[in-house]
């Protein structure tokens, strides 16, 4: 396919037009008075959203050079979303400001390579200033405020804070579409895995078809149990203690299963058998998780342990276990707290090291099960269009909250960038030539998010920026009430991680954009002409 090539200013100007088209579409959503964007879908109803990355991903421009510029800025939004889960609009606005300001300096004869160096130094300085302003998140109230600012909805903030409060910061919170108009929170406490009883006759509640065991012993093994003689010694100890038993094994079959069911029906003792969750190495890891959670030992040939010699000391304990046809939930395992913490740290280290998204997801599930449980937020709305919009807001809010827990919070509403710019200004004064110009590009770009928030509220951005710059650190502009307030006290909070990532990713793409000296694009082939129609019919003849 033939290519079209543009050089220097021609290439950059064409790409800048694409950057502006994408950024101007995204920037209308920023701030408490930001609007929504309607996205046409090839099937189904249009999607209405204020999520920067969702909008950016939909944009493809007809002109190849403009499209290249748009795709570069799309990468800013995507990368920020991957790292922090929120702040995609802010990142796009920052990148646009840097590119527009940088283009003016290139036209005036600045060297892009040295500009880039100055931009990098200024960004590092701003990131340091943001980190120094950051403070740890305190309590459920601040979590709710972070989520509410991200979603632009206080009720969303409350629900995310409730979910996080109940399952701890390491718990899994999933967001699903509800079948009703109500948005509700469901909580699964303890460790849940998707394996149920091996026989329906083991149910203790025949109406609900589930088995409920209070303070049971838990036998954990990776073996297949088919001969009752293998577990007879431990069963005798269970009967003598008058307790109930949960067996988690690779499988329970044949004579062993028959004997357990008959004794359960006769009322001799209550034993429920469950197949071990997972497969292969993941099964071994999950059995070990259950053992650590309940204070038991995995009876395995690898450890030189035999079922016939198992004692009550090697069995786990839990406050209660609920077993359904396809699910088992272990609540309040009696494992050693220090060992559970050590296991959690080990899984976190594995999450940090793995590059596979699938492995990461499975490890996070294991982490949540050990750390506290699973919360499900079911998003309800009157129409599917509204539901999808609410779900996207909820996902952003959850990501922002996780980022806040991870790296702390700072004053929101773009004010942190203004106060960080005071440090960047000091740095710029020490630099010379095009390096100083590069730092000044960042200095100017740091004003863009607050200016954009003010513009979306129908106000003059430059005036608001100058007034905030005169205030002490932590004071900013509340675009909803149009007052200058202490942002943290007023509940306008941003996660430090989101603020930092947005700036770093914007600088990365903008500085690369400015060093572009040629652009190569495919020449689009014209669509083939419609073939001629066939000859006419005989008509009425």
Curated annotation (Swiss-Prot):
Reaction(s) catalysed (UniProt annotation): ATP + H2O + a folded polypeptide = ADP + phosphate + an unfolded polypeptide
Residues involved in ATP binding: 29-32, 86-90, 413, 478-480, 494
An individual GO BP term: protein refolding
Top-rank EC class of the record's enzyme: isomerase
EC number(s) reported in the record: 5.6.1.7
GO cellular component: cytoplasm
UniProt-annotated location(s): Cytoplasm
Keyword Cytoplasm: yes
Keyword tags: ATP-binding, Chaperone, Cytoplasm, Isomerase, Nucleotide-binding
One MF annotation (Gene Ontology) recorded for this entry: isomerase activity
Job description of the protein: Together with its co-chaperonin GroES, plays an essential role in assisting protein folding. The GroEL-GroES system forms a nano-cage that allows encapsulation of the non-native substrate proteins and provides a physical environment optimized to promote and accelerate protein folding.
Similarity-based family: Belongs to the chaperonin (HSP60) family.
Subunit structure: Forms a cylinder of 14 subunits composed of two heptameric rings stacked back-to-back. Interacts with the co-chaperonin GroES.
Name under which the protein is recorded: Chaperonin GroEL
Organism, scientific name: Lachnoclostridium phytofermentans (strain ATCC 700394 / DSM 18823 / ISDg) (Clostridium phytofermentans)
Organism phylogeny: Bacteria, Bacillati, Bacillota, Clostridia, Lachnospirales
